[in-house]
C-alpha cells in the first residue's frame, strides 16, 4: 500500500471520511511472500535474466457508499517483491505516478510512498440469484515498509478472519441473511488502516491486533462483516 508522506489516506480512513482513495500494488500466490527476508537479509532487484512477475497497479476509490477500482497489469522482477526491496516501491516511481494520473489521482508533492505490505488468504463465493459476492479473508499479516514508521515490525498477524459482502443493493438477499448470526456488527473495515493502527499500538496490548473495538472473550474465530473491499499487497 502507498500513501502520502504524512499518511493522508490513512487519516481519512480512520476518520471515516466519505471520499478516500487507496493506492496499492497487488500480486497473487503463496510463493512470493512479502514478509520473508532473503538469505543474508538483502536482495538485488532487477538481476539480468531474473524472472518477472505480473503485478497490478490499483486505485480503489470510495465516495460515500459507491466504490470503484481501476487497475493496470505490469511486469516486475520477482526480487522486487521481497521484504527488503519493498521500500523501493516494486515499480519505478514515475510509472506508479503516471498510472494513477491516468486513473485521475494526483498525489500531493507528486509522489507516493510505500507504507505497508499486507498479505492474506481468500475464498470467494457468489450468491447465484442476485450476484452478491462474499469473500472470507484470513491469515492476514502485515509488515511495515516505510522507514521510521511505528515499530517497523514484520509479519504482524491479525487474529480471526474478515467476511466481506459486496453487491448491487444495501440489503442482503435472503440466502445470505444467516451471516448476521456470526455475532458481529455491520461496519466499514480497512485492512490498510486497521493494520497501521495495530502497528502503532504498544506491544503487549491485549487487543492490539484485533480490528478496532472488536475482541472475543475467549480464543476462537471472529466474524467481521463489512461492505468494503480491500493476496500480497
Q: Where are the regions a protein language model picked out?
A:
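Phosphate-end processing signature that detects enzymes handling 5′-triphosphorylated RNA
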Residues: 1-233
